[in-house]
Each structure stands twice: as structure tokens, then as C-alpha cells.
């Protein structure tokens, strides 16, 4: 059964504007000039509106979800090791991941999600036939289930990142197809490919875009044909988080591709998201442009795994601290 993502309530722009003005007023009362907080007030206003408050409240329950997987259409391009997923997963489970350590230092809970395993778990709950393999709906449902679980736990802000071989190729294919951009303008160097790898990557993106040329406005079909489970799981998380009124900061080209698909599945879902940065992959900027979203940070880093969201989080927390101090 297809997951329904249509029940999204838009964030009221009037409430965003009012909360922004209130936050600016707190600093004016303390000696600041008009609009002295700049974009910080706008981010705080957005957060307050998502929280249903007049001013943004402290973020005490924040989760970083790193969704990992690969794409069956792009196995030969990435220079990542074949067992990179299990290697990175082990770093997270053993507490030796630098990204996880940085998250914990900011009082952020960390979840590492293997997209295929999560979808397989979802399939088991559906009482599928023996030998059945997870597909698109299981990937989307796994993402939605995670977003529901986080909302039920009281998560106040969700940080999203991606990881996996072939992520940049699959994401560039999706973004190029939806935005109508030629392959050479969305391709990046990904995991550190050489010139020969770049040429192969262009060919794979070109072939992938050709394969979805007739379904450019159908996100489910695009996700199914590109066959990148983690991007589909991210799509489910982003769409369902909006339904559950959980604000999200995302980072990375895989997340950007998922955001495009999620917005198509759940109109106005983008109201609940903020991109952390423009990243380092060329496909991210046109994706954010199509979404009408501006990143919190002016520059990005190429590490992935949501590292950029950990750079952006202090900005939102600073906005809540200004609100608390001026209340």
C-alpha cells in the first residue's frame, strides 16, 4: 500500500514574520539596532512558528539521523570501499565516528540508519510473501516510521545527513531530471573520483536521466527507477516529519534530492525544513533554488553524514538564547 504524505499543514508565514519581529524587538530593547540580528532573527522566527510559539524555545531534544545506503545503478563510480557502509556503521555503533562525537558534544542524539535493513524490517511488518524484497513503498514507509518514532519521543529538531557509495551520482540524476539540468552541470567529484571516473559518472547520470525522462513529475517513479534506497528513506523522513510538525535541518546532495521528491509528494512540506549549507556538490544549489530554500551557512563541507547540520545548529540555538534572554 502506498504511503500517503498529503496531510501536511503549512507553516503560517504570518507567524514566522511576527516571531521574527518579536525576536528583533528583544535585541532592540537591549541596545541593538533594528534588524541587528540579520538572518538569525529569521531562523528564530521560523523555528518559533514551527514550535507554535511567539518566540523560539530552547532545543533540548535534537536528533541527528544519518541515513546510509547505495545505489544499484552506480556501483562502479565511487572510490569508496565496497564495505564502506558496514565500516562506517561500525564506527557509529562503537562510538568512534567523528561526526557522532561532534553531535554528542552538542547534546545531539545520533541514529545511524541502514536504509536496506530499515526497509526489510518494514517489509516484515507487512506480512509479505517469503523471499519478497523491499521496494519503493517499504523505503518510504521506513522513513515515515522513523519520523513518527522521533516525533513520539519528543524530538524538537531533526538533523538529517546521508552517506553511501553512489549517493552523489544518484542524487545528481534525480536533481538533474526534476530541474531539467544537463548532466555536466550537476556532476561533482563525489568521493574523490579521477578524470576517468568523472567521465563515467557523466555517462551514468546521462543514462539515468534518460531512464526517467518520461516521469520527471512523478517522484515515486523516479525514486523507483534510480533505485537508491537511502534517498527514498530520506524522502519518507522529510515528508512525514512535516506531517508531524517536526522541523528539520538537512545537509548533503542526497538529502537535497530527497527534499525535491518529498516536496512533490507532500506539497508545503518544505515549510518545515532548513538546508544547512550549499554543500560542495554542484547539484545542491539548483535543488535548493527549486525548493525556494536558502541555506543557513554560506559555505559547505564535503564530509557528508550531516556534518553541516552540526555547524548550523548553534545558529538556531543562539536565536533561542537571545529569545530567552530578552523575554
Task: Spell out what each predicted region is.
Residues 1-327:
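N-terminal loops that bind phosphate or other acidic moieties
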Amino acid at each position: 500500500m502506498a504511503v500517503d504524505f498529503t496531510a501536511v499543514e503549512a507553516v503560517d508565514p504570518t507567524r514566522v514574520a511576527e516571531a521574527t519581529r518579536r525576536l528583533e524587538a528583544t535585541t532592540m530593547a537591549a541596545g541593538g539596532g533594528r534588524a541587528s540580528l540579520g538572518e538569525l532573527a529569521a531562523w528564530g522566527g521560523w523555528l518559533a512558528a514551527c514550535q507554535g510559539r511567539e518566540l523560539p524555545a530552547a532545543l533540548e531534544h535534537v536528533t541527528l539521523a544519518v541515513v546510509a545506503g547505495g545505489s544499484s545503478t552506480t556501483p562502479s563510480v565511487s572510490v569508496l570501499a565496497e564495505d564502506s557502509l558496514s565500516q562506517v556503521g561500525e564506527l557509529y555503533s562503537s562510538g568512534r565516528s567523528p561526526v557522532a562525537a561532534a553531535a554528542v558534544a552538542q547534546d545531539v542524539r545520533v541514529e545511524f540508519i541502514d536504509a536496506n535493513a530499515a526497509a526489510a524490517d518494514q517489509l516484515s511488518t507487512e506480512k509479505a510473501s517469503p523471499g519478497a524484497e523491499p521496494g519503493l513503498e517499504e523505503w518510504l514507509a521506513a522513513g515515515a516510521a522513523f519520523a513518527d518514532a522521533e516525533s513520539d519521543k519528543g524530538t524538537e529538531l531533526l538533523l538529517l545527513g546521508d552517506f553511501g557509495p553512489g549517493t552523489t551520482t544518484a542524487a545528481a540524476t534525480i536533481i538533474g531530471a526534476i530541474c531539467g539540468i544537463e548532466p555536466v552541470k550537476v556532476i561533482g567529484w563525489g568521493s574523490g573520483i579521477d578524470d576517468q571516473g568523472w567521465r563515467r559518472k557523466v555517462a551514468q547520470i546521462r543514462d539515468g536521466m534518460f531512464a526517467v525522462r518520461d516521469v520527471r513529475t512523478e517522484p515515486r517513479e523516479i525514486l523507483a527507477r534510480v533505485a537508491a534506497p537511502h534517498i527514498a528513506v530520506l524522502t519518507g523522513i522529510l515528508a512525514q516529519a512535516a506531517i508531524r510538525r517536526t522541523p528539520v535541518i538537512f545537509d548533503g546532495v542526497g538529502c537535497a534530492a530527497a527534499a525535491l521528491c518529498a516536496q512533490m509528494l507532500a506539497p508545503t512540506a518544505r515549510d518545515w525544513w532548513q538546508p544547512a549549507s550549499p554543500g560542495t556538490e554542484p547539484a545542491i544549489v539548483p535543488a535548493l533554488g527549486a525548493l525556494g530554500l536558502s541555506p543557513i551557512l554560506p559555505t559547505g563541507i564535503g564530509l557528508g553524514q550531516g556534518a553541516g547540520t552540526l555547524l548550523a545548529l548553534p545558529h538556531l540555538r543562539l536565536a533561542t538564547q537571545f529569545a530567552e534572554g530578552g523575554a
